[in-house]
Amino acid sequence: MDIEIKKLTPDLLKDYLHFFETEAHADNSDEDRCYCVCWCSADHRIKTDFSSPEKRRELAVQYINDGLIQGYLAYYEGEVIGWCNANTKSECLNCTSWLRFMTSVDTTETSPDTKTKSVYCLTIAPGLKRKGVAAQLLNRVCDDAAADGFDYIEAYPSKQFVDEFRSFMGPLELYKRNGFTVCQEVKDKYNDIYVVRKPLKLQAGDIK
């Protein structure tokens, strides 16, 4: 499927909002519109109101203009059909979703200079799922992260994939097909997930 992928910028704010108000939650109720505001580099240790779609929309506008939500939009025939939230892991440890659900995930690195990009969401329009859009978005994230000097890409797929709404980080098989390996399993009161990683730089012993 021939799509165009654009890195999210404030210029694309209108497209982003439209996607979340139409295709992203077409299978769900209006109350489910998240705008991906809980996965970002904002500091949610400061009390933040996520209580309604309208308040989450206001936060999305602020966060995108401030560069706190990062990721990529996929376009087909001029319309947004997919979204991947991808951000610097170390900068997102105080967002509300990490603080509430992800504290069992290992955040240590082999070196203080190691840079990891995390994939927090992969959302595809209902009529265009299973057509390779998610894989193309994921590959773009990997390519750009490598060019930006990141060492790893990391993601957190559920062990039991239910559906795109509840398992919004994508299935494990998607990541395995694209060079990721499991580096941790997390099972606690909130999660039953894999932590998967893909190296973006040659490691010692790798063949050039």
Regions found by a protein language model. Give the residues of each.
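Conserved acyl-donor/pantetheine-binding loop and adjacent beta-alpha core of acyl/acetyltransferases
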Residues: Q62, D66, E79-L122, K129, ...
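Conserved beta-hairpin
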Residues: Y16, I69-C84
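Conserved acetyl-CoA-binding loop-helix of GNAT-fold acetyltransferases
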Residues: V119-I124, R130-A146
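Conserved GNAT acetyl-CoA-binding A-motif
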Residues: T116-V119, A145-R166
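Short, basic/aromatic recognition patches
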Residues: E54-I64, I69
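C-terminal "cap" of GNAT-fold acetyltransferases
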Residues: R166-N178, Q184-K208
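Conserved N-terminal entry element of GNAT/NAT acetyltransferase domains
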Residues: M1-I46, F50, A204-K208
